[in-house]
Design a protein with these regions (language model features):
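A small/polar (G/S/T-enriched), proline-flanked helix-loop surface module common
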Residues: 1-156, 162, 173-185
Length: 186
């Protein structure tokens, strides 16, 4: 399966296809969660939001085809929900990026956190949704220039965050722009 059809048609945009190539070195992938993975994750998130205000779940897992020999064995796209804004302390391994409410990238993962208020309730207190793209290979130390990997993980997290914001019908797509902002925040 080609990268643009992973997890849900439209969830992996053109930039994220290139990011997957940087991360995995693969052009073909094992079939994943189907055509409605993002819609299913948004439905699960919506079900959690009302009663509890926090939770976690998986959007999908991405597996390079067995004949691929890339550095990452599996990439998981997960969501986390919180009713409070993110804390300002970001783990040292993450480079802060200016996307939506909070974002960060490392050589093996990235996240984008965005507020989501339904369009039909603009005065409602927004929930915070974090979308993570993470390598599930054994942890390794970063070597050499890790900027391409950081940018790739950030691009992948942004692609899925934007797809989730659209699926959740967040006001103004939760402030997420069509392209990721990869210049570190100051």
């Amino acid at each position: 399966m080609t990268a643009d059809k992973l997890c849900a048609v439209g969830a992996v945009n053109k930039a994220a296809v290139g990011a997957l190539d940087v991360i995995t070195g693969a052009a073909l992938f094992a079939p994943t969660g189907g055509e409605s993975a993002v819609a299913a994750a948004a439905g699960e998130l919506t079900g959690v939001a009302a009663p509890m205000g926090s939770g976690t779940g998986e959007v999908c897992s991405i597996f390079p085809r067995p004949e691929s020999s890339g550095p990452a064995a599996e990439i998981r796209i997960v969501w986390r929900l919180s009713s409070t804004p993110p804390k300002e302390d970001t783990a040292r391994k993450f480079t802060r990026l200016p996307m939506s409410e909070k974002a960060g990238a490392a050589h093996d993962s990235a996240f984008v956190t965005f507020p989501c208020s339904p369009k039909d309730k603009p005065l409602a207190s927004p929930d915070r949704v974090s979308v993570w793209a993470q390598s599930w290979a054994l942890p390794t130390e970063a070597e050499g220039d890790v900027r391409p990997l950081k940018n790739a993980y950030a691009t992948l997290a942004h692609s899925f965050a934007l797809a989730m914001a659209k699926q959740l019908d967040c006001d103004n797509n939760a402030g997420l722009k069509p392209k990721p902002s990869l210049i570190p925040a100051s």
